[in-house]
Amino acid sequence: MTNRWQRTDMPRGEEYDSRWHTLAEAGENIHGEADLVESLLAESGCTNVLDAGCGTGRVAIELAKRGVGVTGVDADAGMLGTARIKAPEIDWYEADLSDPTGIPNGTFDLILLAGNVMIFLEPGTEDRVLANMASRLTEGGLLVAGFSLRPGQLTCDRYDELTAAAGLAQVARWATWDRIPYTGGDYAVTVVCR
Protein backbone atom coordinates (compact mmCIF):
# COMPACT_ATOMS: atom_id res chain seq x y z
CA MET A 1 0.00 0.00 0.00
CA THR A 2 1.32 3.45 -0.89
CA ASN A 3 0.45 6.91 0.32
CA ARG A 4 -2.19 7.93 -2.20
CA TRP A 5 -1.90 11.62 -1.38
CA GLN A 6 1.74 11.73 -2.50
CA ARG A 7 0.74 10.77 -6.05
CA THR A 8 1.44 13.63 -8.44
CA ASP A 9 -1.85 13.18 -10.32
CA MET A 10 -3.99 14.12 -7.30
CA PRO A 11 -5.84 17.43 -7.81
CA ARG A 12 -4.79 20.18 -5.41
CA GLY A 13 -5.98 23.63 -4.38
CA GLU A 14 -8.32 25.31 -6.84
CA GLU A 15 -8.34 22.25 -9.11
CA TYR A 16 -9.57 20.18 -6.16
CA ASP A 17 -12.19 22.81 -5.33
CA SER A 18 -13.49 22.90 -8.91
CA ARG A 19 -15.05 19.45 -8.47
CA TRP A 20 -17.12 20.72 -5.55
CA HIS A 21 -18.16 23.86 -7.44
CA THR A 22 -19.37 21.69 -10.34
CA LEU A 23 -21.39 19.48 -8.01
CA ALA A 24 -22.94 22.50 -6.25
CA GLU A 25 -23.87 24.10 -9.58
CA ALA A 26 -25.60 20.83 -10.52
CA GLY A 27 -27.75 21.12 -7.39
CA GLU A 28 -25.91 18.53 -5.30
CA ASN A 29 -25.62 19.01 -1.54
CA ILE A 30 -21.88 19.36 -1.03
CA HIS A 31 -22.24 19.98 2.69
CA GLY A 32 -23.29 16.57 3.99
CA GLU A 33 -20.32 16.45 6.34
CA ALA A 34 -21.17 19.88 7.79
CA ASP A 35 -24.84 18.89 8.11
CA LEU A 36 -23.91 15.80 10.13
CA VAL A 37 -21.37 17.63 12.29
CA GLU A 38 -23.85 20.41 13.03
CA SER A 39 -26.49 17.88 14.10
CA LEU A 40 -24.01 15.96 16.28
CA LEU A 41 -22.95 19.20 17.95
CA ALA A 42 -26.57 20.09 18.65
CA GLU A 43 -27.28 16.63 20.10
CA SER A 44 -24.20 16.60 22.31
CA GLY A 45 -23.96 20.24 23.33
CA CYS A 46 -20.44 20.39 21.89
CA THR A 47 -19.10 23.63 20.50
CA ASN A 48 -15.63 23.41 18.95
CA VAL A 49 -14.38 21.34 16.03
CA LEU A 50 -11.02 20.33 14.59
CA ASP A 51 -11.24 19.62 10.87
CA ALA A 52 -8.27 17.26 10.61
CA GLY A 53 -7.15 16.84 7.03
CA CYS A 54 -9.15 19.95 6.11
CA GLY A 55 -7.73 20.34 2.61
CA THR A 56 -9.00 23.55 1.01
CA GLY A 57 -11.37 24.13 3.93
CA ARG A 58 -14.70 23.24 2.31
CA VAL A 59 -16.17 21.70 5.48
CA ALA A 60 -14.48 24.03 7.99
CA ILE A 61 -15.62 27.12 6.11
CA GLU A 62 -19.21 25.86 5.94
CA LEU A 63 -19.16 25.08 9.67
CA ALA A 64 -17.83 28.56 10.45
CA LYS A 65 -20.64 30.08 8.36
CA ARG A 66 -23.05 28.19 10.61
CA GLY A 67 -21.47 29.67 13.73
CA VAL A 68 -19.35 26.68 14.75
CA GLY A 69 -15.92 27.34 16.26
CA VAL A 70 -13.59 25.46 13.93
CA THR A 71 -9.86 25.00 13.40
CA GLY A 72 -8.34 23.38 10.31
CA VAL A 73 -5.18 21.31 10.02
CA ASP A 74 -3.65 19.65 6.96
CA ALA A 75 -0.23 18.44 5.84
CA ASP A 76 -0.60 19.85 2.31
CA ALA A 77 0.66 23.44 2.14
CA GLY A 78 -0.98 24.04 -1.24
CA MET A 79 -4.40 22.96 -0.04
CA LEU A 80 -4.03 25.11 3.09
CA GLY A 81 -2.97 28.06 0.95
CA THR A 82 -6.30 27.87 -0.84
CA ALA A 83 -8.14 27.56 2.49
CA ARG A 84 -6.36 30.61 3.89
CA ILE A 85 -7.29 32.70 0.87
CA LYS A 86 -10.94 31.67 1.09
CA ALA A 87 -11.27 32.13 4.86
CA PRO A 88 -8.41 34.03 6.53
CA GLU A 89 -10.47 34.40 9.72
CA ILE A 90 -10.20 30.66 10.46
CA ASP A 91 -7.08 29.28 12.17
CA TRP A 92 -5.32 26.96 9.70
CA TYR A 93 -2.30 24.84 10.68
CA GLU A 94 0.10 22.87 8.52
CA ALA A 95 0.88 19.61 10.31
CA ASP A 96 1.18 15.86 9.96
CA LEU A 97 -1.78 14.36 11.81
CA SER A 98 0.47 11.70 13.34
CA ASP A 99 2.70 14.35 14.98
CA PRO A 100 1.34 15.38 18.40
CA THR A 101 3.34 18.62 18.32
CA GLY A 102 1.85 19.81 15.02
CA ILE A 103 -1.76 20.14 16.09
CA PRO A 104 -2.82 23.25 18.00
CA ASN A 105 -2.77 23.04 21.78
CA GLY A 106 -5.99 22.33 23.57
CA THR A 107 -8.83 19.90 23.10
CA PHE A 108 -11.82 19.72 20.82
CA ASP A 109 -15.38 18.53 21.33
CA LEU A 110 -15.49 16.98 17.87
CA ILE A 111 -12.73 16.02 15.47
CA LEU A 112 -13.63 15.41 11.84
CA LEU A 113 -11.65 13.20 9.47
CA ALA A 114 -13.68 13.72 6.28
CA GLY A 115 -12.74 13.40 2.63
CA ASN A 116 -11.08 9.98 2.90
CA VAL A 117 -8.37 11.28 5.24
CA MET A 118 -7.86 7.82 6.75
CA ILE A 119 -6.98 6.21 3.41
CA PHE A 120 -4.70 9.08 2.39
CA LEU A 121 -2.47 8.71 5.46
CA GLU A 122 1.06 7.40 5.25
CA PRO A 123 0.60 3.61 5.53
CA GLY A 124 1.39 2.41 9.04
CA THR A 125 0.59 5.74 10.72
CA GLU A 126 -3.13 5.15 11.21
CA ASP A 127 -2.65 4.04 14.83
CA ARG A 128 -0.58 7.14 15.67
CA VAL A 129 -3.05 9.45 13.97
CA LEU A 130 -6.01 7.99 15.86
CA ALA A 131 -4.12 8.04 19.18
CA ASN A 132 -3.20 11.68 18.50
CA MET A 133 -6.81 12.55 17.67
CA ALA A 134 -8.04 10.75 20.81
CA SER A 135 -5.61 12.76 22.94
CA ARG A 136 -7.09 15.99 21.54
CA LEU A 137 -10.71 15.10 22.31
CA THR A 138 -12.52 16.38 25.38
CA GLU A 139 -13.95 13.70 27.66
CA GLY A 140 -17.07 12.54 25.82
CA GLY A 141 -15.82 14.17 22.62
CA LEU A 142 -16.59 12.66 19.23
CA LEU A 143 -14.30 11.58 16.40
CA VAL A 144 -16.14 11.35 13.07
CA ALA A 145 -14.46 9.72 10.08
CA GLY A 146 -15.76 8.93 6.63
CA PHE A 147 -13.78 6.94 4.10
CA SER A 148 -14.02 4.61 1.11
CA LEU A 149 -13.82 0.87 1.69
CA ARG A 150 -11.99 -0.69 -1.21
CA PRO A 151 -9.88 -3.82 -1.48
CA GLY A 152 -6.37 -3.29 -0.15
CA GLN A 153 -7.37 -0.26 1.94
CA LEU A 154 -8.50 0.30 5.50
CA THR A 155 -11.49 -1.84 6.51
CA CYS A 156 -14.19 -1.14 9.08
CA ASP A 157 -12.90 -4.01 11.23
CA ARG A 158 -9.35 -2.63 11.21
CA TYR A 159 -10.59 0.89 11.90
CA ASP A 160 -12.59 -0.43 14.86
CA GLU A 161 -9.46 -2.16 16.22
CA LEU A 162 -7.42 1.04 15.85
CA THR A 163 -10.01 3.27 17.50
CA ALA A 164 -10.48 0.81 20.38
CA ALA A 165 -6.70 0.73 20.90
CA ALA A 166 -6.80 4.55 21.08
CA GLY A 167 -9.39 4.33 23.87
CA LEU A 168 -12.38 5.26 21.73
CA ALA A 169 -15.79 3.55 21.78
CA GLN A 170 -18.05 3.26 18.77
CA VAL A 171 -21.24 5.31 18.85
CA ALA A 172 -22.59 4.86 15.31
CA ARG A 173 -21.76 3.78 11.79
CA TRP A 174 -23.60 4.94 8.69
CA ALA A 175 -23.25 4.38 4.95
CA THR A 176 -23.44 8.12 4.23
CA TRP A 177 -23.14 11.50 5.90
CA ASP A 178 -26.95 11.69 6.08
CA ARG A 179 -27.18 8.74 8.48
CA ILE A 180 -28.34 6.01 6.13
CA PRO A 181 -27.71 2.78 8.07
CA TYR A 182 -24.53 0.93 7.18
CA THR A 183 -25.25 -2.58 5.93
CA GLY A 184 -22.04 -3.11 4.01
CA GLY A 185 -20.84 -1.32 0.93
CA ASP A 186 -17.95 0.78 -0.24
CA TYR A 187 -18.19 3.76 2.14
CA ALA A 188 -18.66 4.22 5.88
CA VAL A 189 -19.02 7.12 8.28
CA THR A 190 -18.08 6.10 11.81
CA VAL A 191 -18.58 8.05 15.03
CA VAL A 192 -16.53 7.11 18.09
CA CYS A 193 -16.40 8.70 21.53
CA ARG A 194 -13.67 9.30 24.10
Feature names for model-found ranges:
Residues 155, 168-194:
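Class I S-adenosyl-L-methionine
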Residues 109-124:
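A short SAM/SAH-binding and catalytic strip from SAM-dependent methyltransferases
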Residues 140-147:
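Conserved beta-strand signature within the Rossmann-like core of class I S-adenosyl-L-methionine
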